[in-house]
Amino acid sequence: MSIDIETARRVAHLARIRVDEADLPALAGELSGILTFMEQLNEVDVEGIEPMTSVTPMRLKRRQDVVTDGDMQDKVLSNAPDAREGFFAVPKVVE
């Protein structure tokens, strides 16, 4: 598929990018190259091929889902300019 200069201008406008008039032919050529490559990918027979997310099989390491308090309340609140009863104290913003 070939992209003309007017289509390249429209794509740039829709993408909200400014492209100088002198650069439009190069942009049209690059977009045409991308679409040509996509057309080549569409010709590949992938029937029966299982999709993959990585070339090496990986498994996520799992850990127990245990609820804790984090043992960091004092540490975190020590950075607060104002803390009361274990919470951050902030100025009232709604009357």
From Swiss-Prot:
Q: What's the Enzyme Commission number for this chain?
A: 6.3.5.-
**Entry GO MF terms:** asparaginyl-tRNA synthase (glutamine-hydrolyzing) activity; ATP binding; glutaminyl-tRNA synthase (glutamine-hydrolyzing) activity
| InterPro entries named among the record's database cross-references | Asp/Glu-ADT_sf_sub_c, GatC
Reaction(s) catalysed by this chain's protein: L-glutamyl-tRNA(Gln) + L-glutamine + ATP + H2O = L-glutaminyl-tRNA(Gln) + L-glutamate + ADP + phosphate + H(+); L-aspartyl-tRNA(Asn) + L-glutamine + ATP + H2O = L-asparaginyl-tRNA(Asn) + L-glutamate + ADP + phosphate + 2 H(+)
Q: Which residues form a coiled coil?
A: none
Q: Which UniProt keywords apply?
A: ATP-binding, Ligase, Nucleotide-binding, Protein biosynthesis
Has the keyword RNA-binding been applied to this entry?
no
Q: Which Pfam families does the entry link to?
A: GatC (PF02686)
List, in alphabetical order, the GO biological process terms annotated in this UniProt record.
Answer: glutaminyl-tRNAGln biosynthesis via transamidation; regulation of translational fidelity; translation
Looking at the keywords, is Protein biosynthesis present?
yes
Q: Which family does it belong to?
A: Belongs to the GatC family.
Q: Which NCBIfam families match?
A: gatC (TIGR00135)
- UniProt subunit comment: Heterotrimer of A, B and C subunits.
Q: What does this protein do?
A: Allows the formation of correctly charged Asn-tRNA(Asn) or Gln-tRNA(Gln) through the transamidation of misacylated Asp-tRNA(Asn) or Glu-tRNA(Gln) in organisms which lack either or both of asparaginyl-tRNA or glutaminyl-tRNA synthetases. The reaction takes place in the presence of glutamine and ATP through an activated phospho-Asp-tRNA(Asn) or phospho-Glu-tRNA(Gln).
Q: What is this protein called?
A: Aspartyl/glutamyl-tRNA(Asn/Gln) amidotransferase subunit C
Which lineage do the record's taxonomy fields give for this organism?
Bacteria, Pseudomonadati, Pseudomonadota, Alphaproteobacteria, Rhodobacterales
